[in-house]
């Protein structure tokens, strides 16, 4: 769990501050868990979410947090890596912009050339498609999950139950079946779905994957430690 992760980071000699984002009350819970990790070589900072929908902007990417439907307050998260448009050399030459100034415009900086202000939008094309990863566990299917997961390169979603007969239990416990997660992935037009957060009684989640792929073919029954590399389209 979280204490083990914090200890691992400390043992890896991490010194930069760690930002932890979660529902209201997060700091109290984490501080209580830290009884086994009281001394860490880095600061923990907290961002407690209070709105139903909240965007957290970082340098080059942002995270959209959105409430989901569970027995306690839970959020899903969609991380989007933004990507600027292509630098248009012909426009830069037309404006007589010195080559040594091009990198400043590519970084989003405004420059001045011969007394004239040059802004990035004068030489940059339209923003290109970036990368998007959406993560959601502990919820019944909701419209907000589908909306925030739309066009994700990777959608990581709970598949608590694989057996159709557990549909009633999923509704009662406010969880999803694998089939429901696959249906969201299909409607959201994601590239790939990783199922996770299985019921302890679900010993072999792979047993259900062929049936789930009839709904959404690009489905994986993920396990701890699974990794992938996402790449820009161009």
Give the ranges of each region predicted by the language model:
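Metal-dependent phosphodiesterase/nuclease catalytic metal-binding core
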Residues: 52-195, 204-211, 215, 231-234
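Phosphate- and divalent-cation-binding pockets in alpha/beta enzyme and binding domains
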Residues: 1, 28-29, 144, 204
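Short internal beta-strands
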Residues: 16-24, 156, 194-195
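Catalytic metal-binding/acid-base residues of hydrolase active sites
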Residues: 25, 140, 160, 199, ...
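Di-metal (Zn2+ and/or Mg2+/Mn2+) metal-binding site signature of metallo-dependent hydrolases
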Residues: 1-12
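Active-site-proximal loop->helix
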Residues: 29-35
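Conserved phosphate-binding/catalytic loops in two-lobed NTP-binding clefts
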Residues: 217-227
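A glycine-rich helix N-cap at a beta->alpha junction
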Residues: 36-49, 218
